[in-house]
C-alpha cells in the first residue's frame, strides 16, 4: 500500500542559532523525519542556504549578488548537516534546487516529480530549496513558503507542514494583543489578509505570516491542506501526524474535507 505523501517546510530561523547552524535542531528534525517516514512519504523543503553561507563569509545579505554568493557557499554546508544527521537513520539525502520556471514548464515539473517518485521509492529524503544562486528579486518564492505549496500540489502531496517561528495563525496580532488566540482550524482566508504588504523581515502583521497565508490559500483552492506550527516545538507535529492530536498550531483545510483523517 502506497504511503500518503507530505511536504515538510522549515524556515532558516529554525535552522540557525545566532550565526551558526543549529546542529541540535537539525538532529531533532532528523529524528522526527525518521518517525514520520514510517507512515508517510516525506519531502523536505528547507531554507537556510544563505544563512549557512553567512556563517563562513560575513558579508551583507541584503544585496542580490551577495545573497546569491552566500547561497552557493551555504547550500553544500546545509546539505552536509542533513546528511550527517540522517545517516544514523539510514536515510539517504538528495538535493533538488528549483526556481519559478520549473513549475511553468510541464516538462520540467514532470521530470522533477519523476525524480522525487524514484527517490521516495528507495527511502531517500528529497531536500528541496529555491535556487537562490540564479533567482532574481522578481522571481522568488518568499522564504520557501510558496515553494512548499507548489511542491505539495505539483508533486502529489496533500499536506504541507510549515515549521515556523510562530505557534500558528492568530485571530489578531499576538505582539499587540495579550488575548490573541490561535485559530486551530481555518477553511478560508479573507482577501484583505492576503493583500497586506509583506517582507521577509517584517513583523507579524506584515512579515512572514503573509507568505504563509498565500501558500495556504493556494493549497485550499486546490483541495489540499496546510498545517502551521512552531519549528522548535516538534512534539506538536508529532502529536498531530502520529497521534491524531492537535495540541497547538493551525490546520488550513477545505470546509468539505475531514482534515488530517484523510491522510491517516
Curated annotation (Swiss-Prot):
Binding of ATP, residues: 9, 164-165, 206-212
Naturally occurring in which organism (per UniProt): Helicobacter hepaticus (strain ATCC 51449 / 3B1)
Gene3D superfamilies: Acetylglutamate kinase-like (3.40.1160.10)
Main location: cytoplasm
Subcellular location: Cytoplasm
Keywords, in A-Z order: Amino-acid biosynthesis, ATP-binding, Cytoplasm, Kinase, Nucleotide-binding, Proline biosynthesis, Transferase
Taxonomic superkingdom: Bacteria
Positions that bind substrate: 47, 132, 144
Pathway: Amino-acid biosynthesis; L-proline biosynthesis; L-glutamate 5-semialdehyde from L-glutamate: step 1/2
NCBIfam families reported for this sequence: proB
Gene Ontology cellular-component terms listed: cytosol
GO molecular function annotations of the record: ATP binding; glutamate 5-kinase activity
PANTHER family tied to this protein: GLUTAMATE 5-KINASE
Function: Catalyzes the transfer of a phosphate group to glutamate to form L-glutamate 5-phosphate.
Pfam families: AA_kinase
Protein name per its UniProtKB record: Glutamate 5-kinase
HAMAP family to which the protein is assigned, alphabetical: ProB
Catalytic activity: L-glutamate + ATP = L-glutamyl 5-phosphate + ADP
EC identifiers of the protein: 2.7.2.11
Family named by the database record: Belongs to the glutamate 5-kinase family.
GO BP field: L-proline biosynthetic process
Amino acid at each position: 500500500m502506497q504511503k500518503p505523501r507530505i511536504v515538510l517546510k522549515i524556515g532558516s530561523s529554525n535552522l540557525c542559532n545566532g550565526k551558526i547552524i543549529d546542529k541540535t535542531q537539525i538532529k531533532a528534525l532528523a529524528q522526527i523525519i525518521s518517525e514520520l517516514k514510517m507512515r508517510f512519504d516525506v519531502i523536505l523543503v528547507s531554507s537556510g542556504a544563505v544563512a549557512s553561507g553567512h556563517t563562513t563569509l560575513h558579508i551583507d545579505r541584503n544585496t542580490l549578488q551577495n545573497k546569491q554568493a552566500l547561497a552557493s557557499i551555504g547550500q553544500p554546508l546545509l546539505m552536509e548537516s542533513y546528511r550527517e544527521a540522517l545517516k544514523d537513520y539510514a536515510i539517504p539525502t538528495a538535493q533538488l534546487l528549483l526556481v519559478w520556471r520549473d513549475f511553468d514548464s510541464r516538462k520540467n515539473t514532470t521530470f522533477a516529480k519523476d525524480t522525487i517518485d524514484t527517490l521516495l521509492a528507495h527511502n531517500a529524503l528529497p531536500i528541496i530549496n529555491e535556487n537562490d544562486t540564479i533567482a532574481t528579486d522578481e522571481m522568488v518564492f518568499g522564504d520557501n513558503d510558496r515553494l512548499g505549496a507548489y511542491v505539495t500540489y505539483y508533486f502529489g502531496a496533500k499536506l504541507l507542514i510549515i515549521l515556523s517561528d510562530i505557534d500558528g495563525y492568530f485571530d489578531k496580532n499576538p505582539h499587540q494583543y495579550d488575548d490573541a488566540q490561535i485559530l486551530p482550524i481555518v477553511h478560508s482566508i479573507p482577501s484583505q489578509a492576503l493583500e497586506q504588504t509583506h517582507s521577509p523581515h517584517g513583523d507579524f502583521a506584515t512579515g512572514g505570516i503573509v507568505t504563509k497565508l498565500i501558500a495556504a490559500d493556494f493549497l485550499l483552492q486546490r483541495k489540499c491542506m496546510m498545517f502551521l506550527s512552531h519549528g522548535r516545538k516538534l512534539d506538536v507535529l508529532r502529536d498531530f501526524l502520529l497521534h491524531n492530536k492537535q495540541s497547538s498550531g493551525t490546520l488550513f483545510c477545505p470546509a468539505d474535507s475531514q482534515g488530517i483523517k484523510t491522510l491517516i
